Amino acid sequence: MPEQGPRMNGFSLGELCWLFCCPPCPSRIAAKLAFLPPEPTYTVREMEAPAGTAQPPREEGSGEPAACSLHLSERADWQYSQRELDAVEVFRWRTERGSCLGCMFVRCSPGSRYTVLFSHGNAVDLGQMCSFYIGLGTRINCNIFSYDYSGYGVSSGKPSEKNLYADIEAAWHALRTRYGVTPENIILYGQSIGTVPTVDLASRYECAAVILHSPLMSGLRVAFPDTRKTYCFDAFPSIDKISKVTSPVLIIHGTEDEVIDFSHGLAMYERCPRAVEPLWVEGAGHNDIELYAQYLERLKQFISHELPNS
């Protein structure tokens, strides 16, 4: 999987003062600490209708034609053939806060019951993740739906905590409206910063399951590991929302995570009322859990044997 970004802690005293005192509000903390959008690795173009035919209808809420084509740059590190690329569906969808998001549907397993709504890390976009999605979906027998946060890839707007929550809300409704996938067939998967919108959405909607890959308790607890409570100026307070999640939750974390300490995964697990057996990957860091065999083994076990499949 592509690199998910540099360390979030280990700042100097001066840097920490700048982060949290100019002024100490969650949106500024979030923007300074968490969002590192790369230069876009893809473009989305409207597909022209054949001569003599009408333009395709516009999707309600998207503001864009239904049919678009995906064009990847060299930095996307595409690992498959044109046939797989042609099977990737892309479109744009508008959020309630006005951003127009790039969205992607990877039909890896047409006969599968489940679709994974994947919220990626803080330093990648859909172009970089596309190959990973195809490989993951094929191996766990699920289709993959993903989106770029505001200010990432082709998505308009700027990354912020409020936009993060609005973005996944829009993605949820796009998946349900455009593809007719019902909540009991949706698995929410968040990785790193992607666990933040995932927990927020899961605390408000019930779904088939939730997977939290290297989750964080809150922004302040990442920068200040000794923080024991959530302050009013903290950002991303997932630790206070996880108790409201009513769906089964699988938590995955590397014991040697150098970005979001392993203690975050443990704390989220202990606070979660519907947690299943977690996956603690001995020796894994923040960006290499997918390279360990037990990663796919645990996902397959969870989806194929611990969730309903009839």
Swiss-Prot record:
Active site: S192, D257, H286
Similarity-based family: Belongs to the AB hydrolase superfamily. ABHD17 family.
Pfam families: Hydrolase_4
Species annotation: Xenopus tropicalis (Western clawed frog)
Post-translational modification: Palmitoylated on cysteine residues located in a cysteine cluster at the N-terminus which promotes membrane localization.
InterPro entries assigned: AB_hydrolase_fold, Hydrolase_4
A single GO molecular function term of this UniProt record: palmitoyl-(protein) hydrolase activity
Function (record text): Hydrolyzes fatty acids from S-acylated cysteine residues in proteins.
Uppermost EC category: hydrolase
Membrane topology: Lipid-anchor
Name assigned to this protein: Alpha/beta hydrolase domain-containing protein 17C
GO cellular component, one term: recycling endosome membrane
Keywords tagged on the record: Cell membrane, Cell projection, Endosome, Hydrolase, Lipoprotein, Membrane, Palmitate, Postsynaptic cell membrane, Synapse
Enzyme Commission number(s) from the entry: 3.1.2.22
SUPFAM superfamilies membership: alpha/beta-Hydrolases
